[in-house]
Structure formats: C-alpha cells, structure tokens
C-alpha cells in the first residue's frame, strides 16, 4: 500500500513550515543554520530537511533534531493505582528529586522520557493516585521535560488556528470555523473570478487561493499604500499561484464606477533608453574631460622631472576619483532605470485589474475587514455578476444589521441571512468524555446572500418611499391638509 501511495511531501530548504507542540503552532521558514526558538526551546532545522511533513522530532544536545522513535507501551502490565486521592497531602515533599538533581540528569544527556521515569520512581504519592490522576501527572511532566516538536505543512486550518490562538487581533478575531463557513457560503472553487477585500493579514486571501488551487483569478482590494500578505506568505504557494492574483486600491473604486478612472502617462521603454543614452553621453564627455586633464598633467610631469614622484601620486589619486565617480553614477543610473521599470509594471497591472473589474462579471465577493461593511459592500457589489454569492464578516453584529437594512432597501439581492457560528470543543477519552470547560466566546458574524439583476424602477420607488417614511408626521399632515 505504501508503494502505491508513495511518501508524502518532504521538507525542503526555503519552504515555510509550521512547528507544532500540543496545541501551540508557529510558522517558520526552513533555512540551514538558523536558530529557531519555540516554546522555550532552541534548535536548528538542518536535520529536518528531507523528512516528510508530519514527522515528530526530539531536540537533542546542541539544538539538533532527531526523529523520535515510537515506543510501544505494554498493555499487559497492570498499573498499581489507588482508589481515590483522599489520603494524598500536597506538602511539597512527595518528590525526592530536587531541581539540582534534574539539572544534573539533563547535563548527563538523559532524554526527557527517562527523566519522567525517574520522577515517577522517586515520587512517594504516585502509586496512591488514581489511574486518571497518574495519566494526568505523566502528561504534565512529559510536556515540561520532553522537547518534542512536530513539523507540519501549512494549511488554512492550521494557520487560522495559529493566528486565532497567538494573534487574534491581526485577523479581526476571525475564528477558524467562521472562516470555513465563509469559504462554503462564498462557493469558492477552482476557475472562479473572486473579489476579496480583507484586513486579516492575508489569511482570508490565502484560504481562497488554497481552495481555488491556482485556477481562476483573484482581485484583492486593499486600503492604504499596498496589500498586506503576511499570512499569505506562510502558505508557501508556488509562483504560478500568484500569476492570476491582482490588486486594486479602494481609493480608486469610486472613480472606476463613475467612469473617471485614469492613470498617469506610462513611461515607455524608448524614453528610458533615451534617458540612459543621455546619461551615458554625459559620462563619456566627463571621461574625455578627465582624460584631457590627465594628459596635461603628464606633459607637465615630463617638463618637471624633479617633482616626478609627487605628480605620479596625484595622477593616481585623480584616476581613482574618476573611477569612483563613474561607478557611483552607474549605480544611480541603474537605480533610476529599476525604479522606472517597477512604476511602469505597477501601472500596467493597475490598468489590467481595472479592465477585469469593469467587466462586472465576478463570481463572488468576500469581505472581512476592520472597516464598516456597508459602504464597502454597496460599492463592490457593482462588480459582481447576477446569481453570484457574497459573504461579509464582521466581529460585531450591529454593523451587519445596518448593512442588512441597506441591502433590503437597495434591492438586487436575495436570500439575505445573518448568522453566527457556535463552537465548543469536547474531550473524548474512555469513561471521561465531556465538553471542555473553556470555550470561545464568539467567532464573529456573517452576512451572506445572492446577487440578482437590480430593478432600477423598483429601487427608485423604494428610495422615495424610504424618504417619505423619514418625514415627520406633522409635515405629512400639513401636506395632506393642503391637498384637501
């Protein structure tokens, strides 16, 4: 069976991997001789390169990683355990090993599993504990003394869990089950043309890219000077995934909808060449002038044989100055060309993205930002084709209620639904399965719906009716009296 399936993906240098220890995750790049600090342990990932993802390693002396050998626990051996813990007194004297003794064991190179066994043997109350209490004690000591980590491949589930546990504020407290609901309600699939507006460090964008698998196109709307893709880089997507990833600033959406969108005149490549030629001509002129000066100095040198050594030193210094000046001007010229090339490429991509948006045939819209969702959604829905889903995430319910009301007044959408996901973890163990005492207070709210063709006449009449409803009752009575 293994020969048919083959080994899984292997850890390569330059990959982005996720370190896992119990329920703690950390995303790190896989580089040689780079010190990694994780859960109060430091180590190097050199020995992990070449192993398959999902391998569990043990940190040895010198920060090296070694694959952990699986030890089969004997089930035939019966454990000696007490009936209850009523006779156990927590006086701090039950453990015979001191802190210095444990440190000495570590200095001798004894591994964590052996240290745990020593702690069990030197505990005076371990045999009196119940079987459940003994398992809990062993688990606690293993977590403290066993330096074991697992390297896993990044995915939407792992990265969303990591961000929600470590830095929930960076992803607007977007819980992993809520993100899964967004991908489902948005009908994310390969070949789609999606619009994504998010301020979750690129986590939602990476989840959409992973679901689409590199097929289709994604237009990322961003505020400010540029998009933030810190979490997207942790996925480790190949370069072809980014070929169909476009970006467009939110500040230009209104001008694009009104038809006044325009960019500055693009610098063409011939203009760059002309500029380079002018700079190169200037450099040749300066070279000729400097060479003439050197020739004049050489003639005076022959005339004045007494100061021959001093003139030679002066000529060498001038030649070095000219060479340094030429190199510096060449670097400046290269920097100018590179800057112009990047500006030209950026404007070219901006025009291509604007052309994609003006087609107004996007297959879906995902919004998960820290800004108020109503103006964002009303503007971006103009680029979505009819009969396509849209999903809006917000940490709070009130902004989505206002957005729900505005959409009902505007029209052009059906199947509007405001929902909240409820998540609770369970401990599943023999004879002690129960809900965990701690659970998440909330994972945010989702507003979803489907676009339809907007009836302009109906929307205008509903707008007038809304204005009438906003008029004071006294004013409406006066108008009716005048008509009478």
Describe every region a protein language model picked out.
Residues 184-189, 358:
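Glycine-rich helix-loop-beta junction characteristic of Rossmann-like nucleotide cofactor-binding loops
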Residues 1-170, 174, 180, 212-216, ...:
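Intrinsically disordered, low-complexity glycine/charged-rich regulatory or linker segments
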Residues 362-375, 394:
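A short SAM/SAH-binding and catalytic strip from SAM-dependent methyltransferases
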Residues 252-260, 268-269, 273, 329-365:
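A short acidic, Gly/Pro-enriched loop at the edge of an enzyme's catalytic core
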Residues 2-6, 225-229, 377-448:
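C-terminal substrate-binding/active-site "lid" region of AdoMet-derived donor-dependent transferases
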Residues 230-279, 337, 409-410:
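Acidic, Ser/Thr-rich peripheral helices and adjacent loops at domain boundaries
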Residues 190-191, 214-215, 384-390:
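Short glycine-dipeptide loop
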Residues 189-202, 206-209, 215-225:
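Conserved class I S-adenosyl-L-methionine
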